[in-house]
Amino acid sequence: NAADFLIPVGRIKAHTDFRGEVESGICKMLVIGMGKQHGAYQCHKLGFKSMAANVKEFAGAIIEKKPNMFAIGLIENAYHQTCRIEAIPAGRILEEEPPLLDYAKSRMAKIPFDQADILFVDETGKDISGAGMDPNVTGRSPVLGISRPFFQRIAVFDLTDKSHGNFGGLGSADVTTQRLYRKIDFEQTYPNGITAAEPLAVRLPV
């Protein structure tokens, strides 16, 4: 309440665990990012089935309480390059974020075939995706019912340094390396899995 202005800045993109009018973006940042672990837990405990509606409803309440703000939405292309920047007044966030999400989905990375025996992933990491490996790209998710692309096995070779040992999402892989395992910090990772109610995401592959 002491702040004169609130200016959330964040990427608008497809979420790794739920579908809706708003997914990863300004609304989610207001509810879960700024809410930190307590805010994230309050939203996640209601389940992913209603997550999109809850994020939008909670964000609306925050905007109503804090009207002296505007948001900056960033959209990246398939090469993690910023391709669009939008400044959005507080009163238009709920209206303008959904079409920006549609645009972001049209620009996201895609694997150019639907099926293969094995997918080799050079690096996984929280700086790449909140799920380490983006299920929207790999087709592997402990939550979403994704059928394509389909890979019989997924092998992950390394963890990005910027993840600081957080291996969240590695549970979607079948095989990994000792090199990656040596970088793991369980104390950094497990609170994410517990807060998000996704224990499968933080299990270890072979």
How would you name each of these model-derived features?
Residues A2-G125, G139, S147-P149:
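Conserved, well-structured core segments that form the ligand-binding/active-site neighborhood
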Residues S129:
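Hard-cation-handling environments
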Residues P135-V206:
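C-terminal non-catalytic interaction/assembly regions of soluble proteins
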